[in-house]
Amino acid sequence: MRKLLLSVTCAALMLAACNTPKEPVNPSVLAALDALPALVDSCGIPVLQYCYFSPQGELHGLVQAQDTTFDIPQPVTEESIFQAASLSKPVFAYIVMRMVDRGEIDLDRPVADYTDIERFEDKGMARRLTPRIVLSHQTGLPNWAAGPSSDEWPTSCITFKYPADSCFAYSGEGYAFLQRAVEAIQGAPLDEIARREVFEPFDMPTTSYDWQPAYDTLALVGFNRDGENRGQGRHPRANCAYTLRTNAREYARFIQHGLLNGEGLSDAAHKEMFQHQVHAQRYADEPRACDSSVFWCLGFGAVEEPSAGAGEYYWHWGDNGNFKALWLLHPGTKEGFVYLSNRATGHDLLDPFLKELTGEDLPLNDWIRN
């Protein structure tokens, strides 16, 4: 296929080589991508990497802010690697559903049947947690018992904020608990499992939950809101909730093939992943208007489309502080989009960009940030 260079605005430099789709792409998508350089520059995002796919083909590229004060020692290319943060979780959920298909784990059997619960203060409550409850964030646990990259975390005491299975409560700690069960069942570490179940089948050679030697030059540094270089941010251990590193094109393959098409899953497991499990009121004690149309499935969110009759969007965001990410999938049109960025301002463009991309006033920015 011939290469197409997307337009460059004076506000930012776009270095993009994109596969030309087989048929014309929705004009709103082209307009949204055309607006990215100005948005990236106005938000002060050093690098944003993206991939859009549809039945017509794929558009992918990266945008660099014109601001030259961002000193990035690594080469910036479409192969550059970013922290995907919580985009780690849907990949793990897909792995769990493959295990469900094989009868290796039961969605509604206690996770405690597969691994120990020694870190839990309330062991009776811990025994109520099932993979379904974990994947849909209904554990009642805090996000983390301690900083997950700290030396203290592996032995920290886990306490409940709410009763198990009583409300939506976003928790990386719950996912890490289920990770221990998956590793015990498989008799292998997380990244080895993920490579076999996801990365190799979907052609994701540079994606990993662990630090890889190639990341020394491929992994970009991240910047805080003050524009300070905070480094690549190496993590001490693989964690299914937040340590995934990838690039936009590789992650888009997972969304398209694993989630949209359900490749590697039975029809029943694929359908089950997309079922609403809980109304995702972000803060259990503080209902907000933006919560009303957001739900959680097995591993990712769903948001009802404001326009009647057009179906739902499915999504997940990632936030590791100085790295921000998001993906959006619309099964009705078989379109998907993912972006990765390397500054704490990486979500500042969400409202105008998603409005341009979808034509909808999706409440994702308010839900994530407020």
Predicted feature residues:
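Sec-dependent N-terminal signal peptides
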Residues: 4-13
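Short, gly/Ser/Thr-rich active-site loops of penicillin-recognizing serine hydrolases
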Residues: 278-285, 309, 343-370
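Short, well-ordered beta-strand elements
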Residues: 316, 324-343
